[in-house]
Amino acid sequence: MKDKIFSVLQRVGRSFMLPIAILPVAGLLLGIGSSFTNATTIETYGLTSLLGNGTILHALLVIMNKVGSAVFDNLPLIFAVGVAIGMAKKEKEVSALSAVIAYFVMNTAINAMLTITGQILENGEIAESVLEGTITSVCGIQSLQMGVFGGIIVGLGVAALHNRFYRIQLPNALSFFGGTRFAVSYTHLRAHETCADL
């Protein structure tokens, strides 16, 4: 029993390695880009002619800053996909697609529930009674701020469903939806159902 639990925890830990591997590169891009586009830094070191607005180097550093920031802004989605890939036994690419779909479905369903309960108003603004920082924009969808934890939960759930259903055989009339296609469709339905239960 202990060996089985330890084995599963090892697989979960290894599944974190893929998303974590991108963080140092993204951190360097973000750090260098933001440091050398900071107006105070540029003025303090007298680098206005070299790094000031309108220079080619400034444009390159702004791009580096934005590229590094894109990774950190979307860490939950990256972890959802990485964990789903790492935990899937076979057909890992299908698991990755399922994770992306489930992540968007989860956030859209949460947005709908927040709108229904009046925490997000009809004009898209957040109600005054909601604690600041509780609701944030996730890939353009106003949802609860769950961070990387939400992505990990989605990835683990998708991998569990994928490993169970990616080989399923359906009757001939529905055979198009069998196998990996069923895993993707079923994951979508389960993500919606799970969020509706909340």
For the regions a protein language model found, what residue spans apply to each?
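Transmembrane alpha-helical segments of polytopic membrane transport and secretion proteins
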Residues: 1-3
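Small-residue-rich segments of transmembrane alpha-helices in multi-pass membrane proteins
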Residues: 181-186
